[in-house]
Swiss-Prot record:
Prostate. Not expressed in placenta, decidua or ovary. Relaxin is an ovarian hormone that acts with estrogen to produce dilatation of the birth canal in many mammals. May be involved in remodeling of connective tissues during pregnancy, promoting growth of pubic ligaments and ripening of the cervix. Belongs to the insulin family. The gene is RLN1. It comes from the Eukaryota. It comes from Homo sapiens (Human). GO terms for cellular component: extracellular region. This is Prorelaxin H1. GO terms for biological process: female pregnancy; signal transduction. The keyword Cell inner membrane does not apply.
Length: 185
């Protein structure tokens, strides 16, 4: 008899545990309709939760798959590559075949570095090069947004803010889930 009682007690505890998990997971799917400061406060509250709940949130949304090692590149290498590409485009005596190749694909950093000595052969000093870049950027600032996009000079911060603005507008006008707010933590 005591075994049967303990078995039923264990079964009851397991059912309560499953119910509490379902209730705890439900908060993520609650729809909230907030604007302005209230929305920012809710975002801070959601992002300020304990780390285990953030980890579980990210595991539910996107299963972890190992990325290939080739995709992991330090950001300073990408910036160096972009800088070298910009410099190579302004070199006057650079062969047109190389300029065409640069526009078609993204070359690797070591591949680009072999052409950097061409800067020494050109008549363009570093100060003149900086002045040329500044002039091009000021011309682009006067241009319309489509030309800015074409030149690649539109600001990075605007690109970063776009998803937030769209989400905040949606939360204010229609409503959004706490799960969607937690994705931007």
């Amino acid at each position: 008899m005591p075994r049967l009682f303990l078995f039923h007690l264990l079964e009851f505890c397991l059912l309560l545990n499953q119910f509490s998990r379902a209730v705890a997971a439900k908060w993520k799917d609650d729809v909230i309709k907030l604007c302005g400061r209230e929305l920012v406060r809710a975002q801070i509250a959601i992002c300020g939760m304990s780390t285990w709940s953030k980890r579980s949130l990210s595991q539910e949304d996107a299963p972890q798959t190992p990325r290939p090692v080739a995709e992991i590149v330090p950001s300073f290498i990408n910036k160096d590559t972009e800088t070298i590409i910009i410099m190579l485009e302004f070199i006057a005596n650079l062969p047109p075949e190389l300029k065409a190749a640069l526009s078609e694909r993204q070359p690797s950093l070591p591949e680009l570095q072999q052409y950097v000595p061409a800067l020494k052969d050109s008549n363009l000093s570093f100060e003149e090069f900086k002045k040329l870049i500044r002039n091009r950027q000021s011309e682009a600032a006067d241009s319309n947004p489509s030309e800015l996009k074409y030149l690649g000079l539109d600001t990075h911060s605007q690109k970063k803010r776009r998803p937030y603005v769209a989400l905040f507008e949606k939360c204010c006008l229609i409503g959004c889930t706490k799960r969607s707010l937690a994705k931007y933590c």
